[in-house]
C-alpha cells in the first residue's frame, strides 16, 4: 500500500516537515501582526488610553474634586473601585474590535491584503484564528496599559483585592471573547458601515456592559438585568470585578466562566464561517 501523499513534499525528506509547515506559517502570520503593532506602538497606546483615561479623569478625579462625585463622598470612593474592572474590560473589547474588525474590513475591502494571507499553507479557518490570537494578545497589552491609569488617576482610594488565579484565567478569556467578536464584526461589515458599527453596536455594548456599575445593582430594573445578559461585555466586566474587587457584588463563578466561554465559542464559529464565506466569494 502506498503512503498517503499528504505526509511529504516532493524534493524534501519525509521528516514531518509538511506537518510542521502550517504551524510555521501560523507563527509567521502572528509575528507579522505583532511586528506591525511594535512599529505602530505609539498609535496603539494613544487609541487604547484616550477613552478610558478621559472617563476615569472626569468621573473619578474631577467630579470628586469639585464635590460632584457619583453618590456623594462615600459614593465617589465606591465608584472608583467599581470603575477599575470596568475600564479594564472596556480596554479589552475596544482593542478586540480595533485590532481585528477594522483591519479585516480594510482587508476585505479596498486593500485586498487578505488574499496574501490565505495563500499561506494553512486552512482558511486557521488564518481567521490567527487574527483572533493576535487581537487577543493586543487586548492583553491594552489591559496592562489601562490598569495603572484606572488605579492611580482617581482622587479617591481604589480598594483592590486581587485574585491572581482568577485574573490569569479570566483576563485572557476576556481578550479572546473580544477578539472573536471583532472577527464576527469584521467579516460582516463593509467600509461604509464602520461609523454605523460604532454607533449602534459598540456604544450600546459599552454602556450596557456592567462596566460602570455591577450587574447585581440592576435588580430594581429586572427587564434590563435580564436583557444585558446577551451582552458579552457584562461577563467580561464581572470577570474583572471578581478578580480585582471581589468585595463588590458580582456574578457567580459559573455564570462568568460559562458566559465568556459560550460567547467565545459562538463568536469564533460565526466569525470563521463569515471569514470563509468572504474569502471564497
Please give the residue ranges for each predicted region.
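Pore- or pathway-lining transmembrane helices of multi-pass membrane proteins that form conduits
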Residues: 46-50, 190-211
Amino acid at each position: 500500500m502506498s503512503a498517503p501523499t499528504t505526509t511529504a513534499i516532493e524534493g524534501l525528506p519525509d521528516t514531518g516537515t509538511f506537518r510542521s509547515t502550517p504551524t510555521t506559517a501560523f507563527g509567521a502570520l502572528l509575528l507579522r501582526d505583532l511586528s506591525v503593532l511594535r512599529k505602530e506602538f505609539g498609535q496603539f497606546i494613544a487609541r487604547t488610553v484616550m477613552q478610558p483615561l478621559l472617563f476615569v479623569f472626569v468621573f473619578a478625579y474631577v467630579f470628586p474634586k469639585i464635590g460632584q462625585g457619583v453618590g456623594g463622598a462615600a459614593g465617589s470612593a465606591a465608584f472608583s473601585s467599581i470603575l477599575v474592572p470596568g475600564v479594564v474590560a472596556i480596554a479589552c473589547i475596544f482593542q478586540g474590535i480595533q485590532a481585528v474588525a477594522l483591519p479585516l474590513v480594510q482587508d476585505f475591502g479596498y486593500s485586498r491584503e487578505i488574499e496574501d494571507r490565505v495563500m499561506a499553507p494553512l486552512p482558511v479557518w486557521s488564518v481567521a484564528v490567527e487574527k483572533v490570537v493576535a487581537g487577543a494578545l493586543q487586548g492583553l497589552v491594552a489591559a496592562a496599559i489601562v490598569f495603572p491609569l484606572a488605579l492611580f488617576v482617581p482622587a479617591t482610594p481604589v480598594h483592590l483585592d486581587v485574585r491572581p488565579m482568577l485574573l490569569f484565567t479570566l483576563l485572557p478569556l476576556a481578550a479572546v471573547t473580544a477578539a472573536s467578536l471583532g472577527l464576527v464584526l469584521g467579516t460582516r461589515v463593509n467600509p461604509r458601515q464602520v461609523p454605523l458599527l460604532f454607533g449602534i453596536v459598540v456604544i450600546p455594548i459599552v454602556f450596557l456592559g456592567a462596566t460602570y456599575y455591577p450587574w447585581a445593582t440592576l435588580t430594581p430594573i429586572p427587564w434590563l438585568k435580564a436583557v444585558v445578559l446577551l451582552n458579552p461585555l457584562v461577563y467580561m466586566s464581572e470577570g474583572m470585578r471578581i478578580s480585582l474587587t471581589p468585595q463588590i457584588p458580582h456574578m457567580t463563578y459559573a455564570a462568568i466562566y460559562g458566559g465568556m466561554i459560550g460567547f467565545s465559542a459562538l463568536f469564533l464559529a460565526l466569525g470563521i464561517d463569515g471569514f470563509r464565506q468572504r474569502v471564497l466569494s
